[in-house]
Amino acid sequence: MPVSLARNAGMLSVAVLCGGSSPEREVSLAGGKRVADALGRLGYNATVLDLNRESVGQLLAMAPDLVYNALHGVQGEDGCVSGLLDILGLACTHSHVAASSVGMDKVLTKHVLKSLGIDFPKFDVLTKEELLSAKEVLPYPFVIKPVRGGSTIGVHAIFSKSEYLDLSAHADTLEDRMIVEEYVSGQEVQTAVFLGRAIGTMELLFEGRIYSYDAKYVEGLCEHIFPANLPYDIYNLTLEWALKLHQCLGCKTLSRVDFRYDVANKALKLLEINTHPGMTVSSTLPEVLWLRCGLNFDHVVDLIVQDALGIDDSRRAYIDELMGKTVSREPSHV
């Protein structure tokens, strides 16, 4: 059985908040269950709560030592729940209000990137009505995304005028505000940031124009390559940019930063940051931590919990030594 870093894990209660009403509900439920199972193996007293109108009363009655925020999407990872938990006086995992809110908003994130000198795709912001009227925007191809959303839900890659006109058939997937950005062909890569360090970058191989919902969550539709097959300087740039954005936003404990590398033009573009990375069996951040640092899923969950509770100095020294030994080594082929 895994052993928690917490000396008193068996006395600590953790409420795992997941589900909710966002389009990413199923992903959140899957990740939340996996986290709760890990907490149980570690000896914590874990309870799963599906976010709804009764959740505030349930949390106040439980008075858990910690709330593990396993929510995704609007109202889950956009700072709403973090702010609510702050008001209730309950400690929680993951980034707090400001970092979560800005990180969830793709437009605000791009303005932060500009201030940091980090390259990103050209973009514009349109309303749903403007998109459905086929207003001329960027040159083809381009990608349409909800300003606030994840799991590639409501994302469309548009390569021609006819595809743009066909968007009306998918009107139900469009939000009131949508971001339109240039399509960057090339390698899709993701960088894991954990406990103040950029850990490593993974490459994703899949069929199609974009890293779709099915490619993310259906077994066998995406191949994970670690470390990413990038030029040495580009690989290191993913680490540098990911950590810089994580720190600038004030992210807590962990984040995942997504990139596209345009091989033909040797250009790296930062797409977005996820302050609440997935924890399903196909999620990349736990996999990178295993392949790069030897941290299994239970250990990762334990570290997230302990970082939220405040790791004591002796345990922090152990973690720093562990992470330092693994992260200081460059991947062999980059």
Swiss-Prot record:
Binding-site residues for ATP, renumbered to this chain: 138-190
Gene Ontology CC: cytoplasm
Claim: Nucleotidyltransferase is one of the keywords in the record: no
Database matches in InterPro entries: ATP-grasp, ATP_grasp_subdomain_1, D-Ala_lig_Van_CS, D_ala_D_ala, Dala_Dala_lig_C, PreATP-grasp_dom_sf
Residues that span the membrane, as ranges: none
GO biological process, one term: cell wall organization
Binding site for Mg(2+) 2: E272, N274
Pathways per UniProt: Cell wall biogenesis; peptidoglycan biosynthesis
Subcellular location: Cytoplasm
Molecular functions per Gene Ontology: ATP binding; D-alanine-D-alanine ligase activity; metal ion binding
Cofactor binding: number and manner: Binds 2 magnesium or manganese ions per subunit.
Binding site for Mg(2+) 1: D258, E272
ATP-grasp domain segment(s): 110-306
Primary residence: cytoplasm
Key words of the record: ATP-binding, Cell shape, Cell wall biogenesis/degradation, Cytoplasm, Ligase, Magnesium, Manganese, Metal-binding, Nucleotide-binding, Peptidoglycan synthesis
Catalytic activity: 2 D-alanine + ATP = D-alanyl-D-alanine + ADP + phosphate + H(+)
Domain of life of the source: Bacteria
Top-tier EC class: ligase
HAMAP family xref list: Dala_Dala_lig
Family: Belongs to the D-alanine--D-alanine ligase family.
Annotated PANTHER family: D-ALANINE--D-ALANINE LIGASE, D-ALANINE--D-ALANINE LIGASE B
Role played: Cell wall formation.
Protein name, per record: D-alanine--D-alanine ligase
Biological source species: Anaplasma marginale (strain Florida)
